[in-house]
């Protein structure tokens, strides 16, 4: 790392210590399983241990990236030379921004996967002829989570919370960054333009080419969007906790 970048990174570290973050942490070790359970529940217990921890890790990771981007926002606004600013953005800002923008979709998907598995296991308390017919991991979608979770009161409150994570509003506000990043060319962060030419096919099949651009995502506009998503993820975690506690309450009575 050259001297100029090192000096800028020190500014970032200093700026980060001064940030008063609104990003609360998702909790750990919040549930209590019965001391004695049948071996039948080993799968549920192991899944719950991993899923609750990793969901919290993912949400807290998003919170850290938001804090880092907030600090970088205060640093780059004081860099006047555009070439120097671009170098800092490429080196430090882009990695955090790219991960942060993608994380809400990741977290939503992990919720869907985790809830489907946990509710499927917990359904053993409700179904006398329980069948282990959950789809394979690679094919668990939201509709599958609905199917295996809809008999639980907690899920009825969790589902609308999940629907606010990485939703169409977020997709539009970030210029469809996640989809374009993985399949085409995503918007730039702070500086630069993409999609200078767009191919359009009309309803009549007529093809046209449109000259234009997609402007960069500025941190000043991106950070409130990410903070809202982080809050949505935390709200969903609260509902997830309620669902799990509902599971545990029933499991404790039956087994």
Each model region followed by its residue ranges:
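Acidic, Ser/Thr/Gly/Pro-rich intrinsically disordered interaction regions
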Residues: 1-48, 136, 141-255
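Conserved aromatic-histidine-acidic binding/catalytic patches
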Residues: 43, 50, 54-57, 88-103, ...
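Amphipathic alpha-helical coiled-coil segments
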Residues: 48, 52-69, 100, 226, ...
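Long, low-complexity or tandemly repetitive, helically biased scaffold regions used
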Residues: 57, 68-84, 204, 210-212
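Helix-loop junctions and short alpha-helical segments
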Residues: 65-70, 76, 84-104, 108-161, ...
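Secondary-structure edge/capping motif, primarily at the C-terminal ends of alpha-helices
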Residues: 73-87, 118, 188, 247, ...
């Amino acid at each position: 790392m050259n001297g100029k970048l090192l000096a800028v990174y020190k500014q970032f570290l200093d700026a980060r210590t001064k940030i008063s973050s609104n990003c609360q942490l998702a909790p750990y070790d919040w549930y209590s399983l019965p001391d004695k359970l049948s071996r039948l529940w080993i799968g549920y217990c192991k899944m719950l241990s991993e899923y609750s921890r990793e969901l919290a890790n993912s949400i807290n990771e998003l919170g850290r990236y938001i804090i880092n981007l907030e600090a970088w926002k205060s640093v780059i606004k004081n860099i006047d030379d555009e070439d120097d600013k671009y170098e800092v953005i490429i080196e430090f800002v882009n990695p955090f921004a790219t991960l942060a923008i993608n994380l809400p979709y990741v977290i939503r998907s992990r919720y869907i996967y985790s809830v489907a598995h946990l509710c499927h296991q917990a359904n053993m308390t409700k179904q006398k002829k329980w069948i282990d017919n959950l789809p394979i991991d690679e094919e668990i979608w939201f509709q599958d989570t609905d199917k295996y979770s809809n008999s639980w009161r907690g899920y009825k409150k969790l589902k609308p919370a999940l629907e606010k994570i990485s939703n169409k509003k977020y997709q539009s506000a970030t210029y469809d960054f996640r989809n374009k990043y993985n399949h085409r060319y995503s918007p730039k962060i702070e500086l630069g333009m993409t999609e200078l030419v767009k191919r359009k096919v009309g309803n009549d099949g007529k093809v046209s080419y449109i000259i234009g651009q997609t402007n960069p995502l500025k941190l000043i506009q991106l950070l409130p969007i990410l903070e809202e998503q982080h809050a949505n993820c935390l709200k969903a975690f609260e509902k997830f906790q309620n669902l799990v506690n509902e599971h545990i309450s029933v499991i404790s009575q039956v087994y």
